[in-house]
UniProtKB/Swiss-Prot annotation:
This is PHD finger protein At3g20280. Keywords: Metal-binding, Zinc, Zinc-finger. InterPro entries: Zinc_finger_PHD-type_CS (IPR019786), Znf_FYVE_PHD (IPR011011), Znf_PHD (IPR001965), Znf_PHD-finger (IPR019787), Znf_RING/FYVE/PHD (IPR013083). A zinc finger (PHD-type) spans 45-97. One of its GO terms (molecular function) is zinc ion binding. Disulfide bonds: none annotated. PANTHER family: PHD-TYPE DOMAIN-CONTAINING PROTEIN, RING/FYVE/PHD ZINC FINGER SUPERFAMILY PROTEIN. The keyword Kinase does not apply. Residues 447-482 have a biased composition (Basic and acidic residues).
């Protein structure tokens, strides 16, 4: 059996331990007053070390971390103790015993540390949360403050652009499909306010017509430009003052003074210049409405510009643009009685039915005779002034509102241009009836190379204001016809 071996091994172990303790030197105690931790104060009542009274209330108890003796808080406050210490507390005896040396670790410190940490953690966590909330709060406030700033800035920008766009200009566009071979250019000045109109027409092809109104404080020239595709044509405008007035009070008149540079042998197609009635407001609240329309055809003669309208139509042309606005503007005008007696719309205007039956030379002769009869009839009314003839000329031109651009288109393919044939009797009559033709012709600018423009006509009107306007225009036209 092996029991003897086990007993010998156990005895050897104890002997070895004893031998070791003999060789080991005992350590010097670092803390002579240090006692192992105990829990006696938890199981039994403790007396105060100052007043020696048993402490029954836990709220008034304070234990030293070194000697673990109890003290009353009231007794300690009497010994110049201000309050309960937050960290470890040692009594005066232990402090004097250690004399500045570090205190030994105590059992209660760990327990109290856990208690203090658990008690302080919510406070610290709350403090951290409050500080983070304080940090997040201002950030949110700043973000909330920045959002309105950004939105207001964007709004200010939008309103500024809109207001700027609204105050700078107003655009009105209208697309009209037009088929025409006519071309003309006309420039007029309208008082203190005007409008700029650009009209583009292509030959035998639809083209958009855009109207753009740009208000301006200063005067703006009203320009109507027509683009032609390859046809030989020149701008034609009557000599004199042409304007049509509406029932509204007219303040600013529209003078148009121009001459033609076309030669009699040059084939020139019918030209159409139309301007929609424009209404301008003055400072005193009054408004003016003016609309001008010129329908003129020149086949090597300019006598039919003012009083007659000879239009050669073709069956292949199509109606594209209507002149109802111009007709309404001129029909509403109220001509004076003296001028209405002088004018004869039936004689001055040729109907579309007779256009196909008459040749170009016959039309020119009849129109010149009608102009001569009108001038003789109008001479019997010396009281008529140039200003009174202005609306009547427009009413004569637009007496047939049914005449459209279809009638104004000239058929160059079917009717070739022919030179003008004027009889000698007509030349002798014009020379006898108009002795001042030579004087008036020199004042009219026939060629652009001579440098004589509209100023010559204006000076002629200023020198002889008493002479009627229609008489001068007839004399000029007869001279050009000769």
């Amino acid at each position: 059996m092996h029991y003897s071996q086990t007993s010998s091994f156990g005895g050897n172990h104890t002997e070895i331990a004893k031998i070791i303790h003999k060789f080991l030197q005992p350590r010097v105690k670092q803390y002579p007053l240090w006692n192992p931790p105990s829990r006696e104060y938890m199981s039994r009542a403790m007396a105060c070390q100052i007043c020696e009274v048993t402490i029954n209330e836990m709220d008034t108890l304070l234990i030293c971390d070194a000697c673990e003796k109890a003290y009353h808080l009231k007794c300690l406050q009497g010994n110049n103790m201000k309050g309960v210490p937050k960290s470890e507390w040692h009594c005066s005896r232990c402090v004097q015993a250690f004399n500045g040396k570090p205190f030994p670790p105590t059992y209660g410190r760990a327990t109290r540390a856990v208690a203090t940490t658990t008690a302080k953690m919510p406070f610290r966590a709350a403090g951290v949360l409050s500080s983070s909330a304080k940090k997040i709060g201002p950030m949110d406030i700043k973000a909330n403050q920045q959002k309105p700033i950004v939105s207001t800035f964007s709004r200010l920008q939008n309103t500024g652009l809109v207001s700027g766009a609204a105050t700078t200009s107003q655009f009105e566009s209208a697309s009209v499909n037009a088929k025409t071979t006519a071309s003309a250019a006309k420039t007029t000045n309208i008082g203190s306010q005007g409008s700029k109109e650009n009209v583009a027409c292509g030959a035998n092809s639809p083209a958009p017509v855009s109207l753009t109104e740009t208000p301006n404080r200063t005067g703006i020239a009203s320009t109507i430009s027509v683009i032609n595709n390859g046809l030989i044509s020149k701008p034609l405008t009557p000599v004199g003052t042409m304007s049509s007035t509406s029932p509204l009070p007219v303040v600013n008149q529209l003078p148009v003074n121009a001459t033609s540079n076309a030669s009699p042998s040059t084939p020139i197609t019918a030209s159409l210049v139309a301007q929609a009635p424009t209404v301008t407001q003055n400072g005193d609240g009054s408004s003016t409405a003016s609309g001008t329309a010129d329908h003129s055809i020149l086949n090597a003669d300019i006598t039919t510009q003012v009083h007659t309208l000879t239009v050669t139509s073709s069956s292949n042309s199509q109606q594209a643009v209507s002149h109802s606005e111009v007709a309404k503007a001129t029909e509403d005008a109220a001509p004076l009685e003296n001028v209405s007696e002088c004018e004869k719309p039936s004689e001055s205007t040729s109907h579309p039915d007779s256009l196909n039956d008459k040749t170009i030379s016959e039309n020119v002769q009849e129109s010149s005779k009608d102009a001569k009869v009108d001038s003789e009839a109008c001479q019997n009314h010396p009281t008529a002034s140039p200003a009174t003839v202005v609306p009547d000329q427009d009413s004569t031109i637009t007496a047939a509102p049914s005449v459209t651009q279809e009638d104004s288109a000239f058929n160059t393919e079917k009717t070739p241009p022919q030179p003008l044939s004027v009889s000698s009797n007509y030349d002798s009559q014009t020379e006898k009836e108009t002795p001042n033709v030579q004087d008036s012709v020199h004042n009219v600018p026939g060629d652009s190379e001579k440098g004589k423009g509209l100023n010559g006509l204006d000076d002629r009107h200023q020198e002889q204001p008493s002479e009627p306007e229609f008489y001068k225009s007839d004399s000029v036209k007869e001279e050009n016809a000769a």
